[in-house]
Regions:
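Bacterial N-terminal signal peptides that target proteins for export
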Residues: 1-9
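Sec/Tat signal peptide C-region and signal peptidase I cleavage site
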Residues: 14-24
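Residues at or immediately flanking beta-strands
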Residues: 26, 57-61, 173
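Extracytoplasmic "Venus flytrap"
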Residues: 28-45, 65-69
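Short, polar/charged alpha-helical segment
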Residues: 36-61, 179-184
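Extracytoplasmic small-molecule ligand-binding "clamshell" domains
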Residues: 45, 52-53, 60-78, 116
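Contiguous mixed-secondary-structure segments that line small-molecule binding/active-site clefts
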Residues: 47-51, 79, 84, 89-195
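Short, glycine/acidic-rich beta->alpha junctions
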Residues: 69-70, 194-196
Length: 196
């Protein structure tokens, strides 16, 4: 892959090579969240660890959603080199490829049917990582995805009153990722607003 992020993180994670700080590089990483989100704080912990492991030769500038491009354009911006890396859930791009639902935190589980430990085992040892790489190729993106923070399925929601039937359910408006989740809500007559 042509992305420096891929090469350097692969070396750091698997070989442990340290590079001189004279060749320091700062990678711009745009998230799909604001910088106060817990997930972004965990991302900063990860990038701080990478900076420590590389003796300061690799640093990250974490940018909030929309800093360079809109949320929906984050993946394309990485592919085109406008930003060095992005941080999001893969299911944001399920509208581009339905298999993206397998690798994110789909609303209400999205039919995956396994817990986080089983998911991590499948990803690491059961062929999931290879399918993840194949996903990006099939989407025509020249990127390398890394799994950080597998969070499992998102909750369907928190409601002020019990939902007794679909008529009750259709009274609500949902925030949802673009792609399959948003389309599913639309197909069953529920108003949804795509994130981003």
């Amino acid at each position: 892959m042509r992305k420096l992020f891929t090469i350097v993180l692969s070396l750091v994670a698997f070989i442990g090579i340290s590079v001189s700080t004279a060749n320091a590089k700062t990678l711009k990483c745009q998230t799909v969240l604001n910088t106060k989100a817990d997930e972004v704080k965990m991302l900063k912990d990860f990038t701080d660890t990478v900076t420590t492991l590389t003796d300061g030769s690799l640093k990250f500038e974490i940018l909030p959603a929309g800093a360079v491009v809109g949320v929906k354009e984050t993946l394309d911006a990485v592919d085109k080199g406008l930003i060095d890396c992005g941080f999001a859930w893969t299911h944001y791009w399920s509208g581009d490829h339905p298999a993206a639902m397998l690798f994110g935190s789909p609303v209400a589980g999205g039919g995956v049917g396994i817990d986080n430990l089983a998911f991590l085992s499948w990803f690491q040892y059961g062929g999931g990582k290879e399918l993840y790489d194949q996903l990006w190729k099939e989407m025509g993106r020249d990127i390398k995805g890394f799994m950080l923070q597998p969070v499992g399925p998102e909750a369907l929601g928190w409601f002020p009153k019990p939902i007794k039937d679909m008529a009750d359910f259709r009274k609500y408006k949902f925030r949802t990722p673009p792609g399959i989740p948003g389309q599913t809500y639309k197909d069953i007559g529920i108003a949804s607003v795509a994130m981003g």
